[in-house]
Amino acid sequence: MAAKDVKFGNDARVKMLAGVNILADAVKVTLGPKGRNVVLDKSFGAPTITKDGVSVAREIELEDKFENMGAQMVKEVASKANDAAGDGTTTATVLAQAIVNEGLKAVAAGMNPMDLKRGIDKAVTAVVTELKALSKPCETSKEIEQVGTISANSDSIVGQIIAQAMDKVGKEGVITVEDGTGLEDELAVVEGMQFDRGYLSPYFINKPETATVELDNPFILLVDKKVSNIRELLPVLEGVAKAGKPLLIIAEDVEGEALATLVVNTMRGIVKVAAVKAPGFGDRRKAMLQDIAILTAGTVISEEIGMELEKATLEDLGQAKRVVINKDNTTIIDGIGDEAQIQGRVAQIRQQIEESTSDYDKEKLQERVAKLAGGVAVIKVGAATEVEMKEKKARVEDALHATRAAVEEGIVAGGGVALIRAASKVAGLQGDNEEQNVGIKLALRAMEAPLRQIVANAGEEASIVASAVKNGEGNFGYNAGTEQYGDMIEMGILDPTKVTRSALQFAASVAGLMITTECMVTDLPKEDKADLGAAGMGGMGGMGGMM
């Protein structure tokens, strides 16, 4: 086991604070409408330019082990805020730095760290309650656009596109961000249910100019097994041929003789057929087949419930207005399913989302809800260069997370104003003893830090602006972008309540742990031992000289 280096008390805290300040100073220059960029060197490829706090934090690793521990703990604050609300990482870092600096001063003055922490926790709990009281619902498209614009670092086009996407697919809908091909940002909306499986044979293509299969008013056969024997399919094929409609087969797989016969029938024009694999795997595939069945008023032919493919009739088939299949995706448009049943299925999946503990499962279930309920929107980010594309895509994703958070928990005045208002409301809060009162005061004082940093980044005098904002009331604040005072919500400077709340809670949590740190332990650097092999060779040379 390697030898350890141990530091106690003030020595440990001074080192830790140095690390906290290095990381926070690098991150906080990005805060606000006039925040600056940070350039990150990569071991390969071009440097990355970013204004995203968490991206800067993730890159920082310090040489001094003790300083690095401080930096890593603040990095944890930024990551946690990012995971919870998708934004607010820089605000969280600034708050953590302010609380740690104020707290360690109090510890150095002889205060009891545990009571300070209790005071900080009391202040944060009271302020979070006030933030929830100040919060107003984010309902209109205009408000969604404003939240998106602020989170994308005042890029109004991003705000507009996110608001349009939410209008098209609903606030619960799935919105994804992809690399675009042009210079402009674009919004594409996939109507109907789309899943990522394409045609099983290119011979099914009936629109060669677009390399797609298009079926109008098709029957849809859903099978929960592999189909390789054409005999099983004959009764359904005969029924469909008599009805004179096309057929889409969605099965675990269609192979061998069955696929060959379907291709021949299609090419001869006897019956128009296309086959695709069912989406997903295992239990998720069964669930998605059931989703498609409800959407198209069909039945999944599954041996688990005693149904045989040979005995399937036209009544078991689903129907839709149109189906479009390319080599990668299948889209079912306007299934004839009963609206009440579809809503029932959506409610059932939402219940599963509530109960699920895995983020991955939640995301997949959310996608299923969107496919059943409204469709999927894709924001294609346009840029002139690869470097700009990466930076812009990160901003769009941030803005999307922020707007979702705003829809979830509402909005408060932005620009650091909400924290100042909430802090002033609980200014009379008392702890159990004087040291807790000091903890409460220092936490409330630290809540001015985001506003001060936004103003400092805009090149103004932070103390003057902070004093003016504190003397105002309601949503009165300072717009650093236009250098004007006024009503923040009317000026469109909004923050999602969830983002502000998460930033404060995570910052206080980690800062409290750092204030109560009394000892730090790290590995001693290993000393390189002299290379004995090389020394031996030298001796050999000497012997050669003697001979």
Swiss-Prot record:
It comes from Pasteurella multocida (strain Pm70). Its EC number is 5.6.1.7. This is Chaperonin GroEL. It catalyses: ATP + H2O + a folded polypeptide = ADP + phosphate + an unfolded polypeptide. The keyword Isomerase applies. Disulfide bonds: none annotated. PANTHER family: 60 KDA HEAT SHOCK PROTEIN, MITOCHONDRIAL. It holds the Pfam family Cpn60_TCP1. GO terms for cellular component: cytoplasm.
